[in-house]
Amino acid sequence: MRTIDKRIAPNVRLAATLVARAPALTLAYDARCKSRLAATLDTGEDVALVLPRGTVLRDGDVLVADDGALVRVAAAHEAVLLVRAPDALTLTRAAYHLGNRHTPVEVGAGCLKLEYDPVLADMLTRLGATVERASAPFQPEAGAYGGGHRHGHDATFAEDYALAQQVFDEHHGHSHSHSHDHDHDHDHDHDHQHGPCCSHGHHHGHR
């Protein structure tokens, strides 16, 4: 069995005909996140994938086997949700909640794509988005996913969070409640501009 152990850097240009002749390794997103994997090329050949830990393969990547042969990566069709909305605010709220759950998302023009999840589909529908189940390649945004942070002047935070928590509780049959006390007080005044829609001073009191 051949071992595939190298990925050619994306900035290295290869002849298109050379890449086109290479056998394809077609994988869903979850499999493309694994650095150790037993897989089958589109030719029917079984191979072992042994890449540096933390490697996430993307559609179009070119790999090198231990015999020097090239293998091209293709994103497989898989069950996904296509999320659209009647306005930018609704789509932004949808993206916010998905990011708050560290959900991998592929961002398109006026559309979000994520792996199929009935709980998330329900939540997104209640937020006012249109959710369509489909079969398509999935290639989410690359980068680190961080936790969300609540801001006191986010006027819709409480409403959005309550809706998301309600959906989660209905699907999982229980709720989790976390309370955090902070023993510090500080006030600060500052003027800042948010853009053409906001230009005013704010006084924040945090407790």
From Swiss-Prot:
CDD domains: UreE (cd00571). Residues 170-207 are annotated as: Disordered. It is found in: Cytoplasm. GO terms for biological process: protein folding; protein-containing complex assembly; urea metabolic process. Residues 170-194 have a biased composition (Basic and acidic residues). Its main location: cytoplasm. Keywords: Chaperone, Cytoplasm, Nickel, Nickel insertion. GO terms for molecular function: nickel cation binding; unfolded protein binding. GO terms for cellular component: cytoplasm. Belongs to the UreE family. Involved in urease metallocenter assembly. Binds nickel. Probably functions as a nickel donor during metallocenter assembly. This is Urease accessory protein UreE. It comes from Burkholderia pseudomallei (strain 1106a).
